[in-house]
A protein has these predicted regions:
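Phosphate-/nucleic-acid-contacting segments
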Residues: 147-168
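A short beta-strand-loop-beta hairpin characteristic of the jelly-roll/cupin
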Residues: 57-69
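Regulatory nucleotide-sensing modules
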Residues: 8-60
Length: 168
C-alpha cells in the first residue's frame, strides 16, 4: 500500500478521480532500488509498471553493437513499464537506475485484472499512457534524426530505423 499523496505526484495520473487513487494506493507497492539496478530488459517480458518518486532511470537502446542511445532520463513524477498494462508485451528498451531510486510499482497482472473489474480505471490509466507515449515518440524521433544527421557514418549500420522509435 502507498500514500495517495505519492500517487498524485505522478504526471500520468494527473486528473484522476479520488476514488481511483484509492484503488491504486491499495494495490501498489513502494520499492527502493540501488544504482545500476536494471529494472527492465529489452526483449524480455514486462511484468511491473513503475512510477518514479525519487531518483533517475536511464532508458536506452542499442543503436549499433558499439553505440547505445539513451532516449531518456526518467525523473521523479514520471512512469515507465507501460507494456506491463498489456498482457504478453515485451520491453522495447532497457531501463537502469542511475542513482538510488524510490518507485511505486504495480503488478502488470493485477492491474490488468483491475481493468476488467473497473473500466473507468482502465480508461484513465490507458489515456494517460497514450498521452505519455505520443509525447515521448515526438521527442525521440527528433533525437534519432538529429543523431543520424550529425553522425552520417552510423546510417550504414542501422537496418531498421522504425525499430529505433518504438521505445516507450
Amino acid at each position: 500500500m502507498v500514500k495517495i499523496e505519492d500517487l498524485q505526484r505522478i504526471t500520468m495520473l494527473k486528473g484522476f478521480p479520488d476514488h481511483l487513487f484509492e484503488i491504486l494506493a491499495r494495490e501498489a507497492q513502494l520499492n527502493i532500488y540501488g544504482v545500476n539496478t536494471q529494472l527492465i530488459t529489452i526483449h524480455e517480458r514486462v511484468d511491473t509498471f513503475f512510477m518514479l518518486i525519487m531518483g533517475q532511470v536511464a532508458v536506452k537502446k542499442e543503436l549499433t553493437p558499439r553505440v547505445d542511445i539513451i532516449f531518456d532520463y526518467i525523473q521523479s513524477g514520471s512512469s515507465f513499464g507501460t507494456s506491463a498494462l498489456m498482457e504478453g508485451s515485451t520491453a522495447s528498451y532497457t531501463a537502469v537506475c542511475q542513482e538510488t531510486c524510490e518507485a511505486i510499482t504495480l503488478s502488470g497482472k493485477r492491474i490488468r485484472e483491475l481493468f476488467k473489474e473497473n473500466h473507468e480505471l482502465a480508461y484513465y490509466m490507458l489515456l494517460g499512457a497514450a498521452r505519455q507515449y505520443k509525447n515521448k515518440m515526438d521527442i525521440r524521433a527528433g533525437m534519432i534524426m538529429k543523431a543520424l544527421d550529425e553522425n552520417p557514418e552510423l546510417k550504414k549500420d542501422i537496418h531498421d530505423i522504425e525499430d529505433l522509435t518504438h521505445v516507450i
